[in-house]
Amino acid sequence: MKIYSSIKKRCEHCRIVKRKGKRYVICKVNPSHKQRQG
């Protein structure tokens, strides 16, 4: 998982989710697209 100050969807399968005050990008098709903000 990469940590960025600004996160973007990298493909059409990526979803942005908020958990415990942090924003995540989750991608089931391409797990290498996982990101966290902050």
Swiss-Prot record:
The keyword Ribonucleoprotein applies. It holds the Pfam family Ribosomal_L36. SUPFAM superfamilies: Ribosomal protein L36. One of its GO terms (cellular component) is ribonucleoprotein complex. GO terms for biological process: translation. GO terms for molecular function: structural constituent of ribosome. Keywords: Ribonucleoprotein, Ribosomal protein. Belongs to the bacterial ribosomal protein bL36 family. This is Large ribosomal subunit protein bL36. It comes from Pelodictyon phaeoclathratiforme (strain DSM 5477 / BU-1). The lineage of its organism: Bacteria, Pseudomonadati, Chlorobiota, Chlorobiia, Chlorobiales.
